[in-house]
Swiss-Prot record:
GO biological process, one term: L-tryptophan biosynthetic process
Family statement drawn from the similarity comment of this UniProt entry: Belongs to the TrpC family.
InterPro entries: Aldolase_TIM, Indole-3-glycerol_P_synth, Indole-3-glycerol_P_synth_dom, Indole-3-GlycerolPSynthase_CS, RibuloseP-bd_barrel
UniProt-listed NCBIfam families: PRK00278.2-4
Keywords linked to the UniProt accession: Amino-acid biosynthesis, Aromatic amino acid biosynthesis, Decarboxylase, Lyase, Tryptophan biosynthesis
Pathway note: Amino-acid biosynthesis; L-tryptophan biosynthesis; L-tryptophan from chorismate: step 4/5
Record keyword Amino-acid biosynthesis present: yes
Protein name: Indole-3-glycerol phosphate synthase
Originating species: Salinibacter ruber (strain DSM 13855 / M31)
A GO molecular-function annotation: indole-3-glycerol-phosphate synthase activity
Length: 270
C-alpha cells in the first residue's frame, strides 16, 4: 500500500469514530457554523501578482516533525500580518499531527483571512466539521476520489458556502473534474503515493487546463526564481508550508520570499 492509501484508510476510521462522538446536528450548533459567512478563496487569489497561501503545519510523513514548539494561532497571525492571501491549516492528526482545534484557534485570532482546511476529505461529514471550526475552504484531492465522489463533495461543500481547492497530481486526475464546477485548481508537485517532489509538475499539468480557472501550485516551493517561472506561466497562487515552518519567524519569511520574487521579476523585465 502507498502512503496515500494508508492515510485514507486511517481517515475513514477516524471519520466513523467522530460521527459517533459528535453528530452532525451538534456540529451545526457551534458558533462558527452559522455566525459568519465563509470568505471566498477564488476572490482572495485574484489580487495582482502571485498570491501566497501560507501553511500551518507541524509535521509530515516525509519530513517528520517540522516545527516544535508549535503555536498554530501565533503562526497564522504572523501570516495575516504579512498579507497572506489565505492560510492553509493541516487538520489530519495521525500523519501530520494536525487537529480541528488548530483551525478553531486560528479562526478566533484571524477573522478576515480565508482559511483552508487541508485534510483528506472523503465524507460530507468532514465538510460540516470544516464549517463548524471556521474554515472557509476545503481541499479535495482528486487522486483519492473517484469522479462521482469528487463531484458530490464539491457540490456539498458549495451548498455549505465553502470554497474548494481541487488538487491533482497526475494528468489522469484531470479527467475526473467537472470544469463547470471547479473555480480553483491546485497541482501538487509531491506524488502522494511516494512523497517524491517534481517542481515542474505544476507547469506540465496547468498547460492542459482551461483558462479562467484559478491555478495554485503546491509543495516543494522555496526558491523565488521558481515562483517567478510559475507566475509567468499563468499561475495565480502558490501554497507554501515547510519553507515557512522552518523559519524562525514564518511571517517575515513569507514577506522575504515575496520580495525576492518581485525583485527577480523586475530584473528580468528590465
Amino acid at each position: 500500500m502507498s502512503i496515500l492509501d494508508d492515510i485514507i484508510d486511517d481517515t475513514r476510521e477516524l471519520v466513523e469514530q467522530r460521527k459517533q462522538e459528535t453528530p452532525t446536528s451538534e456540529l451545526k450548533e457551534r458558533p462558527f457554523y452559522d455566525e459568519r459567512e465563509p470568505l471566498s478563496l477564488a476572490e482572495a487569489l485574484k489580487e495582482r501578482g502571485l498570491s501566497f497561501i501560507a501553511e500551518v503545519k507541524k509535521a509530515s510523513p516525509s519530513k517528520g516533525v517540522i516545527r516544535d514548539p508549535f503555536d498554530p494561532a501565533a503562526i497564522a497571525q504572523q501570516y495575516a500580518e504579512h498579507d497572506a492571501a489565505a492560510i492553509s491549516v493541516l487538520t489530519e492528526p495521525l500523519h501530520f499531527e494536525g487537529a480541528l482545534e488548530h483551525m478553531a484557534w486560528i479562526r478566533a485570532h484571524v477573522p478576515e483571512t480565508p482559511l483552508l482546511r487541508k485534510d483528506f476529505i472523503i465524507d460530507p461529514y468532514q465538510l460540516v466539521e470544516a464549517r463548524a471550526v471556521g474554515a472557509d475552504a476545503v481541499l479535495l484531492i482528486a487522486t483519492a476520489l473517484d469522479p462521482g465522489q469528487l463531484a458530490e463533495l464539491h457540490a456539498a461543500a458549495t451548498e455549505l458556502g465553502l470554497s474548494c481547492l481541487v488538487e491533482v497530481y497526475e494528468e489522469e486526475d484531470l479527467d475526473k473534474i467537472d470544469w463547470e464546477q471547479v473555480s480553483v485548481l491546485g497541482v501538487n508537485n509531491r506524488d502522494l503515493h511516494t512523497f517524491e517532489v517534481d517542481l515542474d509538475n505544476s507547469l506540465r499539468i496547468f498547460d492542459q487546463t482551461p483558462k479562467g480557472v484559478g491555478r495554485v501550485a503546491e509543495s516543494g516551493l522555496s526558491d523565488p526564481e521558481t515562483l517567478v517561472r510559475l507566475r509567468k506561466a499563468g499561475v495565480n497562487g502558490v501554497l507554501i508550508g515547510e519553507h515557512l515552518m522552518r523559519a524562525e519567524h514564518p511571517g517575515e519569511a513569507l514577506s522575504r520570499l515575496r520580495a525576492e520574487g518581485k525583485k527577480i521579476a523586475a530584473q528580468q523585465a528590465g
